[in-house]
């Protein structure tokens, strides 16, 4: 028996290339040309196109210059931490490049005035406010399959209410219903997301697990499927307030790249989100410039190329805003050196994710 099997293997090894060619020919006849190909010949799969997140520091931390197209992205964090702001900045950046964007507002809470202030062209933004989770994900699937949408935002997973839950009564126990809905939707979506080159951003909320003795009790809604299907997961937190005299005018925000299939993960970056403005580009350029050694800081004074920018961070930000030429020079210098100094300026440590576990290597 073993001798016969050995002879079969020996015989087939002589004509492996012919056997492979016959198999590939059969697959292409059955499933169409391009069903199987050599990876190196598919140029599109080699280079992942990215859309800027609206934050210079986060673009560097992500390793590819922004959020990836043709992939699933999850942004999660506590309430009022900047999740929707970050998603809207990405939409604005995609629109600047001529992209078509859609926003599925399951929370029914999108503020068009704020979106416009962030740079979103609301006249061209497609918006849907679905009644049920099934309707939201069906709309998402149809838009992705069209191949015409560049960025699609779902805000939020927690607000995707299954139809059975809506039709039931308050207090009905329906365990795992939303998780099953998300799992089924993502199984259908992933292939068409990759083919259509659409970036789908899922915004998610945080919940607390009861009875957790060790590790973080935090978890995200919608089950585990999204954690597996997402190529990038961002944990966004508000870590401080920005004040002008006694008035709070913004938040200091920290974003951790909890998962990244396209570059080394676990980087983290901090930036300012100003009320009514969004991510403070001037604040980021100032902070990254100091960390990279491009902007000099002496006491409270900031200077660039022997020219003083201002005393104090807020004054320096105002100077940069009033002098776009200097701002552009500093930004160019940061981007040119980002590859060499990314590890120094954005060094992060392995952080526990929203389930209190260190994410495994992909």
From Swiss-Prot:
Domain of life from the UniProt record: Bacteria
Keyword annotations of the record: ATP-binding, Cytoplasm, DNA damage, DNA recombination, DNA repair, DNA-binding, Nucleotide-binding, SOS response
Binding residues annotated for ATP, in chain numbering: 77-84
GO biological process, one term: DNA recombination
UniProt-annotated location(s): Cytoplasm
GO cellular component terms, A-Z: cytoplasm
Pfam family, one: RecA_C
One Gene Ontology term of the molecular function aspect: ATP-dependent DNA damage sensor activity
InterPro entries in UniProt: AAA+_ATPase, DNA_recomb/repair_RecA, DNA_recomb/repair_RecA_CS, P-loop_NTPase, RecA-like_C, RecA-like_N, RecA_ATP-bd, RecA_C_sf
Keyword Mitochondrion: no
PANTHER family (UniProt xref): MITOCHONDRIAL DNA REPAIR PROTEIN RECA HOMOLOG-RELATED (PTHR45900:SF1), RECA (PTHR45900)
Family: Belongs to the RecA family.
Protein name (record): Protein RecA
Species of origin: Bradyrhizobium diazoefficiens (strain JCM 10833 / BCRC 13528 / IAM 13628 / NBRC 14792 / USDA 110)
Lineage, opening ranks: Bacteria, Pseudomonadati, Pseudomonadota, Alphaproteobacteria, Hyphomicrobiales
């Amino acid at each position: 028996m073993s001798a016969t099997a050995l002879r079969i293997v020996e015989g087939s090894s002589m004509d492996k290339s012919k056997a492979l060619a016959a198999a590939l020919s059969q697959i292409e006849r059955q499933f169409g040309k391009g069903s199987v190909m050599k990876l190196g010949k598919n140029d599109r799969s080699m280079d992942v196109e990215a859309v800027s997140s609206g934050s210079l520091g986060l673009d560097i931390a992500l390793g590819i210059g922004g959020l990836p197209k043709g992939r699933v992205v999850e942004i999660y964090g506590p309430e009022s931490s900047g999740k929707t702001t970050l998603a809207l900045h990405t939409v604005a950046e995609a629109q600047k490049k001529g992209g078509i964007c859609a926003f599925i507002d399951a929370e029914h809470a999108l503020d068009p005035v704020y979106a416009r202030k962030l740079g979103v062209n609301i006249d061209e933004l497609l918006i849907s406010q679905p009644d049920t989770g099934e309707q939201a994900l069906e709309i998402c699937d149809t838009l992705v399959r069209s191949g015409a949408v560049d960025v699609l935002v779902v805000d939020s997973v927690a607000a995707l209410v299954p139809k059975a839950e809506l039709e039931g009564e308050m207090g009905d126990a329906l365990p795992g219903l939303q998780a099953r809905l998300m799992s089924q939707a993502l199984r259908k979506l992933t292939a068409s997301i990759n083919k259509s080159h659409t970036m789908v951003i899922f915004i998610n909320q945080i919940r607390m697990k009861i009875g957790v003795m060790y590790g973080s009790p935090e978890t995200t809604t919608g089950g585990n499927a999204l954690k597996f299907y997402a190529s990038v997961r961002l944990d966004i937190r508000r870590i401080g307030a920005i004040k002008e005299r006694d008035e709070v005018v913004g938040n200091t925000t920290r974003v951790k790249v909890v998962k990244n299939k396209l570059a080394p993960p676990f980087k983290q970056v901090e930036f300012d989100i100003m009320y009514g403005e969004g991510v403070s580009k001037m604040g980021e350029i100032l902070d990254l410039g100091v960390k990279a050694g491009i902007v000099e800081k002496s006491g409270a004074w900031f200077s660039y190329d022997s020219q003083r920018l201002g005393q104090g961070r807020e004054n320096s930000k105002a100077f940069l805003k009033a002098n776009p030429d200097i701002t552009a020079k500093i930004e160019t210098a940061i981007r040119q050196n980002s590859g060499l100094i990314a590890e120094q300026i954005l060094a992060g440590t392995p952080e526990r994710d929203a389930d209190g576990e260190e994410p495994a290597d992909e």
